[in-house]
Swiss-Prot record:
Gene: truA
Entry's EC annotation: 5.4.99.12
HAMAP family, per database record: TruA
Organism, scientific name: Actinobacillus succinogenes (strain ATCC 55618 / DSM 22257 / CCUG 43843 / 130Z)
Protein name: tRNA pseudouridine synthase A
Subunit-structure text: Homodimer.
GO BP annotation list: tRNA pseudouridine synthesis
Amino acid sequence: MKIALGVEYNGKRYFGWQRQEKVLSVQEELEKALSFVANEKIDLFCAGRTDSGVHGTGQVVHFETEVVRPERAWAFGTNANLPDDIAVKWAKTADDEFHARFSATARRYRYLIYTNPLRSAVLPEGVTHCHLPLDHEKMHEAGQFLLGENDFSSFRAAQCQSKTPWRNVHHLQVTRHGRYIVVDIQANAFVHHMVRNIVGSLMEVGSGRQPVEWMKWLLEQRNRKLAAPTAKPQGLYLVRVTYPERFGIPLSPLGPLFLPDELV
C-alpha cells in the first residue's frame, strides 16, 4: 500500500530535505515520526529535494507499508511526533503507480524578497533582505527570456548531478506587495540551485546593475561563471507539485504566509 503526504516545513534548522549522516534533515525527522506511528521503519520518497535553509509549503512525499492506519492517523499521529517546524498537511492512500518524484509533471517555487534599507528582526527566517530598491517590473521583463525549454547551464550549480541542463519553464512572474517582491516560477523540473541562481541574476537587473537583456545573454552563454551569485536560501519556498488528475493528489493553498494563489 502506498501513502502520500503533503508536508510543510521551515528549513532554517535543516541541512536540506535529504537524509545525511551527522546533520539534521527534514527527511530524517519525518521518517522517525512516521516509523513511530507505523511501528516499523518507513523510507520516504519526495517530489523535490530542497537545499539547506530552503522551506516547503507544498512538498509531496510517499512511502510503502503493509500497516493499516486511517488516513487521519497518518496525519495527526505523525504531527504529534514531529518538531514544530515540520507538519503534515494531508494524508492520502495513493495509487500503486504513483511516485512522488517520477509522477510529478511540474514543480513551483516562490522566492520572497524584503526590500528595505534596514533589516527586519522578525522576518529573517522566511524572506531574503535586500537593502537596495528593486524594480520588479524590469525583473519580470527579464524573466520572460527564460520561458520555454532551454539549456539552463548558466543557472546550474557546479555540483549538479542531473544528466541534462535542459528544463522547461512554464511561467515566471515577478510582483510587488508593499515592501515585498515575489518571484513565482514553475517548470517541469529544476537543476540544482536553478531558482536561487535565477533570482540572484534578476536582482542584478532589478537593482539597475544589469540591463533587462542581460538575462537573455546569460541564458545563451551557458556559463554559470557569468551569472550573479546564488541568492540566499531563506527566501525560497517549494509551494506546489503538480500531478496528473487521475492520482487525486490534493492541492493546498500556495502561500507562503499571507500570499494568495493569484498574485497581481
